[in-house]
């Protein structure tokens, strides 16, 4: 009886883990109206950018939120990145959840311990990169 219980528990956990791994996610789940600043550190040139204009924030948030991502692999000790992005609320606090990530390309991000690939659509990477260059400190 105990053995069946543990086998059943292991099966349920394994199925749950598979569902979690293959489920697509959306990044930048903060409401654009609540966002006060988007901070981008450009790994290509070492410059920091702060985006505070409401229209620019809304466009960036829309392009980020429009794409769903699937986990592809563990990030491990991967070196290098393009646009390290953090979203801050108007209160000055860092937004929680999927609001701190690295944009590597129009269809690839790193968030937490995983790399993700776009499952539909792409990020307007060129717009975000250009905006980060225009707002460099």
State where each predicted segment sits.
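Second-shell loop/turn segments in exported
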Residues: 44-50, 112-119
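Hydrophobic membrane-insertion alpha-helices, especially the h-region
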Residues: 6-23
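Short, solvent-exposed coil/turn segments at beta-strand boundaries
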Residues: 34, 55-56, 102-111
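N-terminal export/targeting and maturation segments
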Residues: 18-76
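Positively charged n-region of N-terminal signal peptides that target proteins for export
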Residues: 1-4
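Short, structured surface segments that line ligand/substrate-binding pockets
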Residues: 69-108
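C-terminal partner/receptor-binding element of secreted or periplasmic proteins
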Residues: 113-137
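Short, flexible beta-strand-to-coil junctions
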Residues: 41-45, 88-92, 115
């Amino acid at each position: 009886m105990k053995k069946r219980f543990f086998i059943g528990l292991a099966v349920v956990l394994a199925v749950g883990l598979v569902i979690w791994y293959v489920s697509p996610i959306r990044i930048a789940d903060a409401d654009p109206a609540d966002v006060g600043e988007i901070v981008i550190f450009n790994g290509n040139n070492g410059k920091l950018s702060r985006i505070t204009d409401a229209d620019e924030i809304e466009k960036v948030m829309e392009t980020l939120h429009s794409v769903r991502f699937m986990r592809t692999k563990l990030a491990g000790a991967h070196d290098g990145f393009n646009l390290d992005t953090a979203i801050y609320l108007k209160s000055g606090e860092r937004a929680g959840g999927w609001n701190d990530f690295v944009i590597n390309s129009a269809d690839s991000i790193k968030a937490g311990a995983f790399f993700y690939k776009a499952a539909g659509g792409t990020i307007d990477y060129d717009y975000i990169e250009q905006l980060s260059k225009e707002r460099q400190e």
